[in-house]
Curated annotation (Swiss-Prot):
Species for this entry: Caenorhabditis elegans
Homology family: Belongs to the mut-7 family.
Keyword Flavoprotein: no
Positions in coiled-coil regions: none
Protein name (database record): Exonuclease mut-7
Length: 910
């Protein structure tokens, strides 16, 4: 059989020779001169290049050539002609040419003599987009011609679907036109270039509105309908993002970003939310359904529930009918009475009201006893437990009786500011408790003030600053600024909160404080959470807490013996009037942060006499840099020899339980456990590694749909997502606590204990960690070394550009002397069609390797795969008796030093 001619890859030098463009003189000589300068010291380049440019201009002028034509030819010949940033020969040349023309005093005459329309057109063609403005000035190109040229380039870029380039031109030259929404803005969004699209329409309210309306049309419709809507963009390959990004929560998040977040980052209009009616309705519906669930399934207080519902019903009439239907269609009598109660409260309890679902209209035509019960319920609800005028509330009703004062007017704010100022006269530093309650996120635009109440505790009194009432009263900005200054200025008081940075950020959203309150300048804010963490870092035994992570309720329970009632935590703090329970709940948090802070300090003083209390307090300052806790020095799995790893894991097989072989165990890991998943593959477990959350969900749906032998265990860690997974996949979901805090070996031990894995010595590299394939080809190290030397060192000139001739015969002879005993008994058969042929193939029991073609073929596969040998460091081949594994499906190379434990043995994914 006649040998097929061998096609060798070209070296870099050969490619240069083949594709090099030859330039005529003097362009060729000048080009080489400039290249030589650019290869010299960086600090000298610009000065020398600009001096040389002036020599060229003077030389061309004296010789009488067309200086404009020569300038265009030089621009074409520049080695870095397409460069758009950093030091650029083309830019320097163009700038110097413009300066030289002006200094010559003959610019007008030279233009009349040499500058033609053809040269102007050629000039526009040779320069980059960023150079066109300067070039137009030098080559006397009119604004109309310049705009026409840029517009043509922009349209051409759109036609080629090079949307980023088109957007850059439109932004730079202000060329955004009405038709660009359909042909440029949407394609940018649908190809994952959101930030570019936002920048492009940052000053175009009409297109911002169009963008919101486009995505809002997808809210609430089926996936099939969304696919049909986007079909034209899919067919033309404009849309490259996965469909999952435009459905469900990801679509909601995208619209929220456009109408809220972008008002700050890209100066978008603040009125965009009114064009997202479906999104707004959907958000309110979800919030109300969650509120109903909290009330009927988790025992949320009725007054809290009712307050939240009527506030949303009042602000968003479009949710009345669907929510009332949601309550009524439950066929739960209590919920139906609830629906009737809301209808009466809203004044729509009529058989003709269009805001009622049909079933409720029918009810009001012939009402039964539920109507009477609903009216009685409404009477109870309307007599909310709100403070009477002048009624004094207390945090504690016992002998302490800590008073609560409301601040709703300018005069009350003035009095509070004077009280805060008086704290400076105290002989010892005063601790001020600080907390805040926020408005519901679904009823608050991102650019509005987030904060509803600020709570302060000092001198055995709690002050509740009612931000909502003060906003309604249009309190002057000066009072807000005075309040913030007295509290966080140069005051000697210590303001204490829990996880306080979030409260400070919320306070800074008050319009009057947005520009004046600099959180980074705050020096007297201290965080109870950081204080407790710092003490636990010293010694967990000091506070005797069961864990290092905690909420405020945990600390008050363990340290004060006080149980915090959190039923009001998710109240609608924007709704007025505030109920007694809300007021007392809010006030209590401000009290306990100070008392817990002081309690911790007293415990530290008592149990650790050597502790530096001042330092501990100083390090709990909100603005203090967080401690660098460092990273635990875990031993990476790839540095552990296989037999050592095997010895560790085999001891975790329980003989009283049925064992499982690694390849029989099928799992999919959560997106936060990708590294753990690769380690499981390392020991042979069949693992799916999702690329992202949408990919994870896609796999879960597919696994559930197919079922049977395709079912897999879902491995995650305790979290909110785990709770959600258990609801849908309870029988398959496993959460392993603290998994991310374990070393790789401990992670495997935890898994082996859980599944009772039967691992064996021969299981070395049973599965590719990249693609999960079990089709591995094992080669002695010298064979892969030969491949690396030929394909990487020689052909690609990676390490030795001077290697023009490869010592092929020397390597061939070396292959013939490989001793199988040095490489786990792997026998290699070397073959080539003729003694001088460059076709060299190494064959082992599980496959073969075509060395000079960089291709491996597994015995059980029909096609070969390119070996990813360039990923292997050259140093790997210096260790003796090393065996390598090539994946027959993806070409990944891995190695292990198991063959000779006496040598510098290691297990390494290369």
């Amino acid at each position: 059989m006649e040998e097929e001619p061998y096609k060798r890859k070209l070296t870099k030098a050969e490619k240069k020779a083949k594709y090099r463009t030859d330039y005529a003189e003097p362009l060729k000589s000048r080009r080489e001169v400039l290249k030589a300068i650019m290869n010299g010291p960086e600090s000298e380049r610009e000065r020398k290049v600009r001096a040389k440019n002036r020599e060229f201009f003077n030389e061309d002028y004296r010789s009488g050539v067309n200086i404009y034509g020569m300038a265009v030819d030089m621009m074409k010949a520049m080695p870095d002609r397409g460069k758009t940033s950093g030091q650029s020969l083309a830019v320097w040349y163009l700038e110097d040419f413009g300066v030289w023309l002006k200094e010559s005093g003959q610019e007008t005459e030279l233009r009349q003599k040499y500058l033609t329309g053809t040269i102007q057109i050629n000039a526009l063609d040779v320069c980059t987009i960023g150079q066109k403005q300067l070039l137009s000035e030098i080559f006397d190109i009119t604004k109309e011609k310049f705009t026409e040229d840029i517009t043509q380039l922009l349209d051409a870029a759109i036609k080629k679907q090079d949307f980023s380039v088109a957007a850059d031109m439109a932004i730079q030259y202000n060329l955004l036109r009405d038709h660009h929404f359909e042909h440029l803005v949407l394609p940018l969004m649908l190809s994952g270039k959101d930030q570019t699209a936002y920048k492009l329409i940052s000053n175009n309210e009409r297109m911002q509105q169009q963008l919101v309306e486009f995505f809002d049309r997808m809210v609430g419709i089926s996936v099939v309908a969304v696919e049909e809507m986007l079909k034209p963009y899919k067919e033309t390959k404009i849309m490259t993002i996965p469909m999952e990004k435009l459905t469900g929560k990801t679509l909601d998040k995208l619209i929220s970003t456009i109408i809220n977040k972008n008002t700050h980052e890209y100066n978008f209009s603040r009125e965009l939310s009114k064009f997202a009616k479906n999104h707004s309705q959907n958000g309110n519906l979800k919030a109300l359904k969650f509120n109903i669930s909290e009330r009927y399934e988790k025992g949320k207080s009725d007054d809290n529930y009712f307050q939240h519902m009527v506030e949303t019903f009042t602000k968003a009439e479009d949710v009345r009918e669907p929510i009332l239907f949601y309550l009524w269609s439950s066929n739960d009598t209590e919920k139906q009475i609830d629906a009737i109660c809301f209808a009466i409260y809203l004044g729509i309890a009529s058989s003709s009201s269009y805001q009622l679902p049909n079933v409720m209209r029918d009810f009001f035509r012939q009402p039964d006893s539920k109507l009477r019960e609903a009216k009685e319920l409404l009477v109870r609800r309307k007599t909310l437990q709100v403070p009477l005028n002048g009624e004094q509330l207390f945090v504690f009703e016992n002998e302490r009786r800590t008073q609560i004062h409301m601040v709703k007017t300018e005069s009350e704010m003035n009095y509070l500011c004077s009280e805060i100022k008086s704290l400076s006269d105290e002989p010892a530093p005063v601790y001020v408790g600080f907390d805040s309650e926020w408005k519901p996120s679904n009823l608050t635009a991102v650019h509005d003030s987030k904060i509803a109440i600020i709570q302060l505790f000092f001198k055995n009194c709690v002050w509740l600053v009612d931000c909502v009432e003060l906003e309604k009263a249009n309190m002057a900005d000066d009072w807000w600024q005075k309040f913030a200054s007295r509290l966080f200025g140069d005051s000697p008081v210590k303001v204490v909160g829990f996880d306080m940075r979030n409260d400070l950020d919320a306070m800074a959203t008050i319009p009057a404080l947005k520009s004046s309150m600099k959180i980074e300048d705050t020096k007297n804010a201290f965080d109870l959470k950081r204080l407790a963490e710092n003490v636990c870092d010293i010694d967990m035994e000091i506070l005797e807490l069961p864990k290092k992570t905690f909420k405020l309720a945990d600390l008050t329970h363990y340290l004060l013996g006080l149980e915090l009632d959190k039923t009001e935590q998710c109240s609608n703090w924007q709704c007025r009037p505030l109920r007694k329970k809300q007021i007392v709940y809010a006030a209590l948090d401000a009290v306990v942060v100070v008392e817990t802070f002081k309690k911790i300090l007293s415990i530290v003083e008592e149990k650790n006499k050597d502790a530096d209390i001042e330092k501990i307090v100083r390090e709990s300052n909100v603005m203090a840099p967080k401690k660098d806790k460092g990273h635990k020095s875990y031993r990476k799995l790839k540095t552990i020899p296989w037999l050592e790893l095997y010895d560790i894991l085999r001891s975790h097989r329980n003989p009283t339980r049925s064992p499982q072989r690694p390849h029989d165990i099928k799992v999919i890991v959560d997106t936060m456990l990708i590294g753990f998943g690769k380690n499981l593959r390392r020991v042979g477990i069949d693992v799916i590694l999702p690329k992202d959350v949408s990919d994870f969900r896609k796999y879960l749906k597919e696994i559930e749909r197919v079922g049977g032998e395709h079912l897999r265990h879902i491995i995650t860690v305790p979290s909110k997502s785990y709770e959600a997974l258990k609801m849908d996949y309870d029988n398959y979901t496993i959460a392993i606590p603290e998994l991310n805090n374990m070393s790789p070996v401990d992670q495997l031990i935890e898994f082996f204990d859980l599944f009772n894995v039967d691992i064996r010595p021969e299981d070395v590299y049973p599965r590719c960690t990249e693609c999960n394939s079990r089709l591995q080809i094992k080669f002695p190290g010298p064979v892969l070394h030969f491949l690396h030397q030929y394909c990487v060192i020689h052909v690609q000139n990676v390490y030795r550009a001077d290697m023009s001739e490869f010592p092929l015969e020397e390597w061939w002879n070396r292959m013939l002397h490989i001793n199988p005993d040095d490489y786990d008994g792997v026998k290699v058969e070397m073959s080539r069609p003729s003694p001088t042929s460059k076709w060299i193939v190494a064959t082992v029991p599980t496959g073969c390797l075509h060395i000079t073609r960089q291709t491996a073929l597994h015995t059980n596969l029909p096609d070969g795969i390119e070996v990813r040998i360039h990923k292997v460091p050259d140093d790997e081949f210096k260790r003796r008796n090393l065996s390598f594994y090539v994946c027959g499906e993806c070409g990944t190379v891995a190695c292990d030093g198991r063959g000779n434990q006496a040598s510098e043995s290691t297990s390494q994914e290369c």
